């Protein structure tokens, strides 16, 4: 499978033409272009991951205590408006903000790997690990950090993932949501 980057407007148009859950971008484009579409029935997921809503479903699980070393004031430094404006699209802004978070707390950044959907892996230490979890993950490296993130989520999901990461690092939820809105 090949990967291409498309702008936000084109992405939204393609996504709006989805007819069934799990339909790939290739299937949608084939249908729109009048090309043959394989009618292989894909397995439907049992649940769709929504990080911002998953906290509402309590599940007993071990949650390690994480020491946070980033002062609340430092989170305001996370957003360099000039550099953020130079990023290309939502994916670029998402990656830039994650890399900025890494710069604030390099030693504890590995805790970001704990952020996962119910059946979805969002962060990993390698591209291959994300592709193994989902062939359509479209993994991107977070700067030169050695950490990778899946980018095939819509902008709202990217915002929810970023906000969850910020809160995990000790950021106030209101500040985290404000920063995430910049994606």
UniProtKB/Swiss-Prot annotation:
The record's InterPro entries line, in alphabetical order, gives: Arc_rbn_hlx_hlx, Ribbon_hlx_hlx, SeqA, SeqA_DNA-bd_C, SeqA_DNA-bd_C_sf, SeqA_N
Gene3D superfamilies attached to this UniProt entry: Met repressor-like, Replication modulator SeqA, C-terminal DNA-binding domain
GO biological process per UniProt? negative regulation of DNA-templated DNA replication initiation; regulation of DNA-templated transcription
**Where does this chain mainly localize?**
cytoplasm
Pfam families from the UniProt entry: SeqA, SeqA_N
Q: Taxonomically, which superkingdom? A: Bacteria
Instruction: List the subcellular locations.
Output: Cytoplasm
The family database entries (SUPFAM superfamilies) matched by this protein are listed as:
Replication modulator SeqA, C-terminal DNA-binding domain, Ribbon-helix-helix
Tell me which UniProt keywords the record has, alphabetically.
Answer: Cytoplasm, DNA replication inhibitor, DNA-binding
The record's region (Interaction with DNA) falls at 90-91
Q: Which GO terms describe its cellular component?
A: cytoplasm
Q: Which GO terms describe its molecular function?
A: DNA binding
Q: How does it assemble?
A: Homodimer. Polymerizes to form helical filaments.
NCBIfam families from the xrefs? PRK11187.1
Q: What does this protein do?
A: Negative regulator of replication initiation, which contributes to regulation of DNA replication and ensures that replication initiation occurs exactly once per chromosome per cell cycle. Binds to pairs of hemimethylated GATC sequences in the oriC region, thus preventing assembly of replication proteins and re-initiation at newly replicated origins. Repression is relieved when the region becomes fully methylated.
Say which family it is in: Belongs to the SeqA family.
User: What HAMAP family does the database record attribute to this sequence?
Assistant: SeqA
Report what the protein is called. Negative modulator of initiation of replication
Q: Which organism is it from?
A: Shewanella oneidensis (strain ATCC 700550 / JCM 31522 / CIP 106686 / LMG 19005 / NCIMB 14063 / MR-1)
